[in-house]
């Protein structure tokens, strides 16, 4: 199985060979719960997201990725931040691609659908905000969710 390995400020990390604009989406339901997926490629919990395709806006990509990975339809409602730390690289073992992080974190409200796992997610669930800290996730996802929970959408993170 193909894996994703995240490296943070690691001198032994492979050098990045690509930069792919991507989106992540904090989707919230009427109860205030956050939509989370368990990633198939590293078994960590994360918000849905993925690469922006050519000819697609970031909002369109966010809605598409959320639907593909979770079965949930959503409407984009805000921006939390832009994450582009060159010290964070992601190795994809299937093809040797090493990406420098470049992700835009958006907020959204759920508008329909049922949580449904996909080939990219082994589990999909609504998580109460107060339970997020107990979920296993990589450092950059924890940082992003921390910014969301702190209410950064009024003052986006740029880093």
Kindly give the residue locations of the regions a language model identified.
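Conserved Nudix-box catalytic region and its N-terminal flanking loop in Nudix hydrolases
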Residues: 29-72
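Short, well-ordered beta-strand micro-motif
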Residues: 27, 105-109, 128
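Nudix hydrolase/Nudix homology domain
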Residues: 43-44, 114-159
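A short coil-to-beta-strand element that immediately follows conserved catalytic motifs
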Residues: 73-83
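Short connector loops at helix/strand junctions that flank enzyme active sites
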Residues: 20, 40-42, 47, 74, ...
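Acidic, metal-coordinating catalytic segment for phosphate/diphosphate chemistry
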Residues: 1-24, 96
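Active-site-adjacent beta-strand/loop module that shapes the phosphate/pyrophosphate-binding cleft
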Residues: 85-114
């Amino acid at each position: 199985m193909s894996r994703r390995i995240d490296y943070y400020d690691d001198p032994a990390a492979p050098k990045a060979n690509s930069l792919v604009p991507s989106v992540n989406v904090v989707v919230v339901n009427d109860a205030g719960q956050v939509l989370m997926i368990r990633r198939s490629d590293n078994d960590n919990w994360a918000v849905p997201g993925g690469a922006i395709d050519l000819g697609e806006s970031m909002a369109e990509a966010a809605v598409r990725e959320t639907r593909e990975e979770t079965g949930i339809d959503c409407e984009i409602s805000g921006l939390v931040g832009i994450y582009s730390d060159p010290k964070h690289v992601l190795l994809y073992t299937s093809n040797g691609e090493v990406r420098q992080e470049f992700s835009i974190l958006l907020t959204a409200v759920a508008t329909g659908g049922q949580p449904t796992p996909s080939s990219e997610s082994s589990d999909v669930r609504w998580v109460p905000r107060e339970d997020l800290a107990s979920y296993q996730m990589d450092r950059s996802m924890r940082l992003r969710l921390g910014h969301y929970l702190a209410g950064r959408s009024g003052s986006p993170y740029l880093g």
